[in-house]
Amino acid sequence: MKISDVKKALQTVETVTFKLPDGSILPPHFHVTEIGCVTKHFIDCGGTERTEERANFQLWEAGDYDHRLAPQKFLHILDVCKNVLGDEDYDIEVEYQQSTIGKFGLDFDGTTFLLTNKYTACLAQDACGIPDKPDQESDNCCTSTSANGCC
């Protein structure tokens, strides 16, 4: 989801609600504590230099149980952030504190913002020797005559 998508969605809802990938809803007293631009400059395992940029929203909950972030206030925060983000329509990554800081993608189902799981991946599979997945499963891949009897 991009910043422009969030702005459009905020214009259609009466309350701002976030749902975690496990289906649980963030407490309604959450705060948006940071919005910024994150740049990741790195070299992948194949030796290719890469740069990724995205907007980062940090969500946090405090003990102020009466706090609610109205859609209009969230839009105002996004407008203030133009000083940092400029006019770039970045993809969004969301941080939310759980047992550690979780990083999520963001989607919208028409009423609720959905925090989506993010996964690691090799960006240079051809260069670092990761084999292609076989097209068909073998019938005898897990037989007792396997080298160690397991799959």
What is each model feature region?
Residues 27-48:
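Short, solvent-exposed beta-alpha or beta-beta edge segments that form flexible loop/patches at the rim
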Residues 42-43, 56, 72-74:
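Structured interface patches
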Residues 13, 27-29, 50-54, 87-89:
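Short connector loops at helix/strand junctions that flank enzyme active sites
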Residues 4-34:
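Small/polar-rich, solvent-exposed N-terminal microdomains that initiate assembly or binding
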Residues 51-64:
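Short glycine-rich, basic-tinged beta-strand/loop micro-motifs
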Residues 120-151:
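Cysteine-cluster motifs in flexible loop/terminal segments that predominantly coordinate metals
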